[in-house]
Structure formats: structure tokens, C-alpha cells
Amino acid sequence: LLSIYTLKAQDTRLNNVVNTLKERITLAGYAQVGYTYDDAGEKASNTFDLKRAIFMARGKITDKWSCYFMYSFANTGKILEAYTEYRFLPQLTARIGQFKTMYTIENPMSPCFVELINCYSQAVNYLAGINGSDPLYGSNSGRDMGILIYGDLFKKKLSYNFAVMNGQGINLKDKNN
């Protein structure tokens, strides 16, 4: 009888742990494939390719403190985002780590929301360093390392973002101190 009670108590504790993890950890992902046909030049070409294969994990440490991780399996594979953020007030949140820069309106949008494989305008590609069109900035997928202070004011009628970024792009430490 004692061993049955012990097993039930252990089972209850395990269920509590599993339920807590389910409430606090979110896993997600998506993939986008494409087909390209090009008849310019001497030879026509066509190909299928894997544009994006993304894995995401979000952890809720407390009601105010969270963390986020995003990894891309497409091409060479790399960490796209890894950051933690703390919400001091509904109007004031601080984020530190590697994340999308808030330089344009389009850059923070997910490709799933835009619903196009090549989803950014040429200006955003250049300014945010998404596709490597700026030779000085390189191709950083519109991401960088740094700290971001952001929030919404006046019942979400005014949003602000203030960031101090590394300037080197993703997965690189600062080269000029």
C-alpha cells in the first residue's frame, strides 16, 4: 500500500513538472520552399530550393522575464536570434542578445506574416543588411547583437524602440571596441 502511494505521489509530481513546462515553453517552426525559373542569358535554368527552415523556442521564466531562441537549418545553418527580455512595466521592456534590428517597419515582420518567399523591398534589403546588397554591412538577415529598450505609450498609440547595437551582424563580436 505504501509503494502504491509513493508511486502516485511521484506521478503527481511528474505531472506537475510536465504541466509547468508546457505552460512555460513554446516550440515552433516553419519551412518555406521555392521554385525559380530564369530564362535570362544563354541558358534557361530552373530549380527548387529550401529558402527557410526555422526552429523557434520561447521560454517564460517568470511573468516578466522571458527568453527566445531561433535557429535556421537552411543553407549553412546558423543561430538567427538568441535573447532575453524583461518587462519592467507594460510601457517599458528591455531586450539583450541577438535579434532583428528595428531599423525599418518591414524588417521586424516575420516572412510568414508577409507570405512571400522574397518578402522585403530592395530598400529594406539594403538598409537592414538582409541580402548582402550593402558591401559594408554584409548579409546579416537584418539582425545584430545589442540591447533594445522598447514599449508602447498612450494606450498603444505611440510605439518606441531605442537600440544600441554591435554593428557587426549576427554571431560576431564587436571588432572595433
Regions found by a protein language model. Give the residues of each.
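Short, intrinsically disordered, charge-balanced linker/junction segments flanking boundaries
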Residues: 168, 173-177
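Outer membrane beta-barrel
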Residues: 14-167
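Bacterial Sec-dependent N-terminal signal peptides
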Residues: 1-12
